[in-house]
Amino acid sequence: MKYSTFFDIILYIKLEGENTMEKMNIKWNYTNKIVNDLLKINRAREIVDLLEIPVSVEEEIKKETIAKRVHYSTKIEGNSLDLNTVKKIIENTNNSHERNVLEVRNYYNALMYLNKEADTNNSITEDLIFKVHNLVIGKNLNAKATYRDGQNIVEDSLTKQIVYMPPEAKDIKVLINQMIKEFDNKTSKDIPIPIKAGIIEYEFVTIHPFWDGNGRTSRLLANYILKAYGYDLKGFYVMEEFYDKNINDYYNSLQMGLHHNFYFGRKDADITEWLEYFISTMANTFEAVGNRVKEIYLNSKEEVNILDTLDKRERWIANYILNNGKIKAKDIASHFKINLDTANNWIKEWVNRGFLVRENDKQIRNVDYILTDKYQQKIK
């Protein structure tokens, strides 16, 4: 086991001789930035809840969101696969057993498990943590799980310098149970859910209870809390993408310039800086989703308005062209039981109004007509 300083060695010897430890005693404060960002989050929620968009579009966004959550959360931990490859893995078109592929598949399974769990459950338990972590590292959901039984030092991959020395193994269960208890504590009921999610993400990754998968599990738990308590934004948001864009900001906000040793300040840390970062990231993510939903909504409303301008004849013609590619005067005459002159007069009116257009200007007889670009784009 490696230690960074003489003081780490002395502290380790001291703690090994004790049967109990002080619990985590993190602190935080509301700041103007946190309050303003919480307001932004709630405004975005109202927009997304209020504005209905086409179901097909909604499902496509959800599908894209899941792929991005998997991609960016595993990328943060060093996975080198690109987004398109991740999508293929999720769609079961890439069955490789290469490590990066397995990591993506495992994370996807854990995400799907928690999404389903959040529909009927909103608590955090040790059993839930074990199950999620089992899936993250590729074990069966109900496999026997244990916390790490030794020290798990986090090092800089390039310099090999110690970045973080988490609590000793013997303290993990106490710290996890404290985290769970405080999350469910009645006195914490008035704390906004985004802040509670941020606290859980920080505390879990700080406790670092497992040998591997701690960062991924911490982000999964935060997303689980947001979904379970109605902050999932219909499954449209991806905070991990914002983390990845400025990965140094993410790590610096977690570390907050504190000593690398858990016992030298991290267990008593003021995490306001981290919460400002977490809530700000969430607000930026939610605002982006809200703006996207507004744009989709307005476009879909325009489509509906165009359809509303069509009478029964025009609706039939639009549907006929969509199914057959084009229409002739004789097709209209046959369906509506009118003569060709009347059908051609209707067509002339529709051409002048910008509803129909000749498919080929060189045609003189038996002319084919199609929808104008305006209607082709809006009527699908």
Kindly give the residue locations of the regions a language model identified:
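FIC/Doc superfamily catalytic core
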Residues: M1-K380
